[in-house]
């Protein structure tokens, strides 16, 4: 079947009332950005849905795949656009039915947005169904559990006919909900947290704390790859890599061993808070899950949050671990997240970390050293990378260059 359009249905944009135009425009921009590098199509965003006009050479499968990853899209259908005549609809219905397997069943489903169309819904269903039965052998009607469903939408401008409905990612278009800073550790949770806030229309930049030589280049490349996977859905993402070694060593030198985990995370939050103001973000996002580990109890969160007035969003706060793993697999980050490279959260881990840290005590331990200068230095020496969906690490670039030189 050669389709001439893709019908793109909006997600929650239908709920946005007077702001709908802003949301539709942002979604259209996101679609154009996602389809960059492809040709043979024209994007037409309308108030209630989007149409993508296809030329003969358009790669419909690749376009559909990319659209399915964009937040704000509920579903996509390859469609035939036909004239508003029963003859044109009948001819299209026969085209669809010619693709059916022998002895298969079908139904005709009509939605009549144009109430002025001369035939009502049931008349159209009977007429088109009857035409298929007359013209196509060895098929029958089953309205409850059909093998195939020919869908017909009667709209003001034309008739749109289709069979397939490809699920989209739902949510809201990224860029409509402000900017946040995602604390990206390299584990299973934080990429899922990032994806969850992006689903709500939020733009993200990511921050990662790197402590060489205790953390390896492979750990850094792992985080780059996680960012790249996130970028597949939203376009380029800035990744800020913080040199954290000296700060982490100092914490472990001056703070009581049971409190080093709490204090380390307070230092991370202080660095993140400064970066938030530099990049114009409105919140910090992390993958914390209530009670999962010692640093994620309510007492720990209270002690850690105290160093910032910036809102800290925790999309996974009440999820079961299994739910997070399922989502990680769905978005494609799980296999990368479980690669066995240590991040700064797993080094210097005390044997018996405090689970209910006393806020006054952690402040007292940290007061023996002025950390502000070290924090400022860490922020000043941040390495910022812009990660695209086709980003390659230095190691990959070097490997490709060696291959090219050899050839």
Curated annotation (Swiss-Prot):
Top enzyme category: transferase
Alphabetized UniProt keyword annotations: ATP-binding, Cytoplasm, Nucleotide-binding, RNA-binding, Thiamine biosynthesis, Transferase, tRNA-binding
Involved pathway(s): Cofactor biosynthesis; thiamine diphosphate biosynthesis
Gene Ontology CC terms: cytosol
Chief location: cytoplasm
THUMP domain segment(s): 61-165
Single GO MF descriptor: tRNA-uracil-4 sulfurtransferase activity
Gene3D superfamilies named among the record's database cross-references: 3.30.2130.30, HUPs
One family name in Pfam for this protein: ThiI_fer
Superkingdom assignment: Bacteria
E.C. number(s) listed in UniProt: 2.8.1.4
Binding site for ATP: 183-184, 208-209, 265, 287, 296
PROSITE patterns linked to this entry: THUMP
InterPro entries named in the record: Rossmann-like_a/b/a_fold, ThiI_AANH, ThiI_fer, ThiI_N, THUMP_dom, THUMP_ThiI, tRNA_STrfase, tRNA_sulfurtransferase_ThiI
Keyword set includes tRNA-binding: yes
Keyword Repeat listed: no
Coiled-coil region list: none
GO biological process: one example: tRNA 4-thiouridine biosynthesis
Catalytic reaction list: [ThiI sulfur-carrier protein]-S-sulfanyl-L-cysteine + a uridine in tRNA + 2 reduced [2Fe-2S]-[ferredoxin] + ATP + H(+) = [ThiI sulfur-carrier protein]-L-cysteine + a 4-thiouridine in tRNA + 2 oxidized [2Fe-2S]-[ferredoxin] + AMP + diphosphate; [ThiS sulfur-carrier protein]-C-terminal Gly-Gly-AMP + S-sulfanyl-L-cysteinyl-[cysteine desulfurase] + AH2 = [ThiS sulfur-carrier protein]-C-terminal-Gly-aminoethanethioate + L-cysteinyl-[cysteine desulfurase] + A + AMP + 2 H(+)
Cellular location(s): Cytoplasm
Transmembrane regions: none
UniProt record similarity statement: Belongs to the ThiI family.
Database matches in PANTHER family: TRNA SULFURTRANSFERASE
Free-text function comment from the UniProt entry: Catalyzes the ATP-dependent transfer of a sulfur to tRNA to produce 4-thiouridine in position 8 of tRNAs, which functions as a near-UV photosensor. Also catalyzes the transfer of sulfur to the sulfur carrier protein ThiS, forming ThiS-thiocarboxylate. This is a step in the synthesis of thiazole, in the thiamine biosynthesis pathway. The sulfur is donated as persulfide by IscS.
Protein name: Probable tRNA sulfurtransferase
């Amino acid at each position: 079947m050669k389709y001439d359009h893709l019908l793109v249905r909006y997600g929650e944009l239908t709920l946005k009332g007077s702001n709908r135009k802003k949301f539709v425009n942002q979604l259209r921009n996101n679609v154009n950005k996602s389809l960059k590098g492809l040709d043979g199509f024209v994007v037409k965003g309308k108030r209630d849905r989007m149409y993508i006009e296809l030329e003969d050479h358009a790669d419909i499968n690749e376009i559909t795949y990319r659209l399915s990853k964009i937040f704000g899209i509920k579903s996509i259908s390859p469609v035939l656009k036909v004239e508003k005549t029963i003859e044109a609809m009948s001819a299209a219905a026969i085209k669809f039915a010619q693709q059916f397997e022998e002895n298969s069943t079908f139904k005709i489903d009509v939605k009549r947005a144009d109430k002025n169309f001369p035939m009502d819904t049931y008349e159209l269903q009977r007429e088109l169904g009857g035409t298929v039965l007359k013209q196509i052998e060895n098929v029958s009607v089953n309205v409850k559990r059909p093998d195939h469903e020919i869908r017909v939408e009667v709209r003001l401008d034309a008739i749109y006919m289709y069979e397939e409905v490809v699920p989209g990612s739902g949510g809201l278009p990224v860029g409509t909900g402000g900017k946040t800073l995602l604390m990206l550790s390299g584990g299973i949770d934080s990429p899922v947290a990032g994806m969850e806030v992006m689903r709500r229309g939020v733009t993200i930049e990511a921050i990662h704390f790197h402590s060489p030589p205790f953390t390896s280049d492979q750990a850094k490349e792992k985080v780059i790859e996680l960012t790249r996977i996130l970028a597949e859905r939203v376009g380029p993402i800035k990744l800020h890599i913080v040199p954290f070694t000296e700060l982490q060593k100092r914490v472990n030198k001056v703070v009581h061993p049971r409190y080093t985990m709490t204090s380390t995370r307070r230092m991370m939050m202080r660095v993140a808070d400064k970066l938030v103001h530099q990049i114009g973000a409105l919140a910090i996002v992390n993958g914390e899950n209530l009670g999962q580990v010692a640093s994620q109890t309510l007492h720990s969160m209270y002690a850690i949050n105290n160093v910032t007035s910036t809102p800290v969003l925790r999309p996974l706060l009440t999820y079961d671990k299994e739910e997070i793993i399922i989502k990680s697999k769905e978005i494609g980050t799980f296999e990368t997240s479980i690669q066995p490279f240590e991040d700064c959260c797993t080094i210097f881990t005390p044997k018996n970390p405090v689970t209910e840290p006393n806020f006054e005590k952690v402040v007292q331990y940290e007061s023996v050293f002025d950390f502000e200068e070290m924090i400022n230095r860490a922020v000043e020496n941040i390495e910022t990378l812009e990660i695209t969906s086709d980003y390659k690490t230095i190691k990959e670039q070097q490997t490709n260059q060696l291959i090219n030189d050899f050839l």
